[in-house]
Amino acid sequence: MNNIIKMLNEEQMKTDVPQFGAGDTVVVKVRVVEGGKERLQAFEGVVIAKRNRGVHSAFTVRKISNGEGVERAFQTHSPIISSIEVKRRGRVRRAKLYYLRDRSGKSARIREKLATK
């Protein structure tokens, strides 16, 4: 029974998900259906939380839109996600960046992780 569940979970998982973590700036392209038409909607922001649970993995992205903070939670292996692109790597020391909710402006900036040689 356990092997069947594991096999079904592996079958539903996507293989083209890039490596990213909290502090990284990502662009998530989401399929949106409006009146019979399907289009891609991009949501760009900072990953403030990531949860790794196999097929149930999820992550939360935060962005500032018109001066207002907007957060959106995504299931990593969801069929509505077309692609995930990592724009920049952030250097943080926490796994969950919920403290960014209380900050704005320069104090909400995240240092960039420089590539090692």
Swiss-Prot record:
Q: One MF term in GO for this entry?
A: structural constituent of ribosome
Q: Which GO terms describe its cellular component?
A: cytosolic large ribosomal subunit
The UniProt entry, under InterPro entries, shows:
Ribosomal_bL19, Ribosomal_bL19_CS, Ribosomal_bL19_sf, Translation_prot_SH3-like_sf
Q: Which UniProt keywords apply?
A: Ribonucleoprotein, Ribosomal protein
Q: Name one Pfam family in it.
A: Ribosomal_L19
One GO term (biological process): translation
Q: Which family does it belong to?
A: Belongs to the bacterial ribosomal protein bL19 family.
NCBIfam families documented for this protein = rplS_bact (TIGR01024)
* Its job: This protein is located at the 30S-50S ribosomal subunit interface and may play a role in the structure and function of the aminoacyl-tRNA binding site.
Which HAMAP family does this entry report, sorted A to Z?
A: Ribosomal_bL19
Q: What is this protein called?
A: Large ribosomal subunit protein bL19
The protein's organism comes out as Shewanella halifaxensis (strain HAW-EB4)
